[in-house]
Amino acid sequence: MELKRLGVSWRFLMVLVLILQSLSALDFDPYRVLGVSRTASQADIKKAYKKLAREWHPDKNKDPGAEDRFIQISKAYEILSNEEKRTNYDHYGDAGENQGYQKQQREHRFRHFHENFYFDESFFHFPFNAERRDSGDEKYLLHFSHYVNEVLPESFKRPYLIKITSDWCFSCIHIEPVWKEVVQELEGLGVGIGVVHAGYERRLAHHLGAHSTPSILGVISGKITFFHNAVVHENLRQFVESLLPGNLVEKVTNKNYVRFLSGWQQENKPHALLFGQTPAVPLMYKLTAFAYKDYVSFGYVYVGLRGVEEMTRQYNVNLYTPTMLIFKEHINKPADVIQARGLKKQVIEDFIAQNKYLLASRLTSQRLFHELCPVKRSHRQRKYCVVLLTAETNKVSKPFEAFLSFALANTQDTVRFVHVYSNRQQEFASTLLPDMEAFQGKSGVSILERRNTAGRVVFKTLEDPWTGSESDKFVLLGYLDQLRKDPAFLSSEAVLPDLTDELAPVFFLRWLYSVSDYLSDFWESLLHSNWREMMPLLSLIFSALFILFGTVMVQAFSDSNEERESHPADKEEVPEKAGKTEPSFTKESSSKIPKKGFVEVTELTDVTYTSNLVRLRPGHMNVVLILSNSTKTSLLQKFALEVYTFTGSSSLHFSFLTLDKHREWLEYLLEFAQDAAPIPNQYDKHFMERDYTGYVLALNGHKKYFCLFKPLKTVDEETVASCDPDSSRGKPSCGLGPKPLKGKLSKLSLWMERLLEGSLQRFYIPSWPELD
């Protein structure tokens, strides 16, 4: 009887506990957690989430309940940011099996109840559930939007180590202790940590290419690399180190330190030197070098190496304490020094951040210009830039040395000193210098203030060129004093053009780097037999090979057919009548050109010269054929055939110019063409005999340049050219037949393709000459 009463009591207690747990679970309201109404829009929900996440993030809020509060905020945002889960919650009070926070809490507490009262603890303490197993992973959990918007951009400054896990994963449990130990060490060094639950974030796991759990991968500069070795502490540490580029830190010795420190002028960066007691470069220093690779060049000196005594003695370095030096324009004396027995990452980063620019940096890109000369936000945040416009030299010039010494003596928070190579940034320099001719070959100094991001600036330029004399320094100092008293002292206003990126790699190098990355990815996939990821690449390669093979075969057969057809065509060719002037298509070409097709070719005369060239609309070009009265018919026919396929472009116009009438105009243009045939003078006896027939000029009237096509000389033409010129006074013994005239324009279609591609050389002229 007592046993029955005891059993009833236990059952009643179980039911009571379950009811209480359910009621407590109902307290979780995502709308109340985020502080929004049930009719709130997605924008309001996102805004509230960002505000609360910043306030309750465990790294920023030291409140003991901050972590639990942050988890509730994240769960609430997961429910309300997904329309389907939000609808489920509004109708049923639950967001689904994957996201129901109250369900997870209920299951957790229900299991806890059974563990204490009914079942063996050794069974139910086995950590199958990911959330129960490691609550420390909660703050590292990644969602797809978080990965795309934050992790990927941040990976260009620091590498990320990401673990892919799931529920009911025995191997995940096995690697957990090693993972915790590695995370604790690497996170302190600056490595980003992430955890992806494959059950809840299938889209992100698929995006990362993780098809099994557990998986560990690294993300750096947007590139994903998988870890394939045994999960031990040393292997994971080496894996993170292998993600970093190999040329981040240069080993500096007594033999190369002068060359290393002298690179500031070419690289336009300060140089950092760390003196350490270990032969290998510390990982923390490599991570710092990666974060600031765009601003500072890093070197490492092992103090235990023979021959470094001269360096340590010159810079007064303590051999028993880690020391970091920053060098700028002067290599004999460091600009800043930090020395501590235990250099922490935050201390190093603050030290580098304060010294990431030279004393007078060179403006090599628009991004650097925005950073050094920011747009003013208020009257108290005015930033002025003193710009030295000077010519590029191999050695430091006297004007620049004087400018540097002036900058060192007049360093202020509101004034930044920079310099520009005027020969590399000509448009930028010409905007600031009022009279370029007066400053030709000389240096000038301007003081400017940016007003908006569109390039609008106000500035004041020193009237005389900058020589670095004491009088120049006195004048510049007076300008700065007047500027502090009256900001309206900068009286000139202009819109500066964007700076060209001087240090950007050329196209060939970018292409080479891309090919190298593809090859390394392919080799890694091949080694580890990741065929699922390799299939798109293999499909692309085989498709390209198939297309290439098909193109070669088609070209081979078409060439052989053309050769067979060309022989009878040559035999049937009949010279054209001399009196025919209109272009007509031959029988051979009629198969290639539609019957109703025609090419409109107008003559370039003094009447049509202005409309067809001088006032031609921007973006339009006039393709002009040079011919003579005797070659007009034949050349126009061939010209029409060659350019017919390009007549679909409305920006191309076609004309011809008679050499007998306008020879002087043509020879004036050819004087501006590089590698063109030398232009004879009027006293040369062969002056009027030079043959320009078959030349084609593509004239851009708006931008005042032209491209030149010169026909290749055939064997018959060379024979004609070798004839005695005196024979031309009598009956000529040799002349141009139809074959040479036909061959003059044989390569014109290829030239036209290059013209449309924009790969032809352009010859600029100051103005279009008169057409007499």
Swiss-Prot record:
It is found in: Endoplasmic reticulum membrane. Residues 29-93 form the J domain. The chain crosses the membrane at residues 534-554. Keywords: Autophagy, Endoplasmic reticulum, Glycoprotein, Membrane, Signal, Transmembrane, Transmembrane helix. Changing residue 478 to A: In strain: Czech II. It comes from the Eukaryota. Residues 1-25 form the signal peptide. Residues 26-533 are cytoplasmic. GO terms for cellular component: endoplasmic reticulum membrane. Residues 561-580 have a biased composition (Basic and acidic residues). GO terms for biological process: regulation of autophagosome size. It is a single-pass type IV membrane protein. Residues 560-591 are annotated as: Disordered. Residues 555-772 are extracellular. Disulfide bonds: none annotated. PROSITE patterns: DNAJ_1, DNAJ_2, THIOREDOXIN_2. Residues 119-245 form the Thioredoxin domain. Glycans are attached at residue 629. Plays an important role in regulating the size of autophagosomes during the formation process. PANTHER family: DNAJ HOMOLOG SUBFAMILY C MEMBER 16. This is DnaJ homolog subfamily C member 16. It comes from Mus musculus (Mouse). The lineage of its organism: Eukaryota, Metazoa, Chordata, Craniata, Vertebrata.
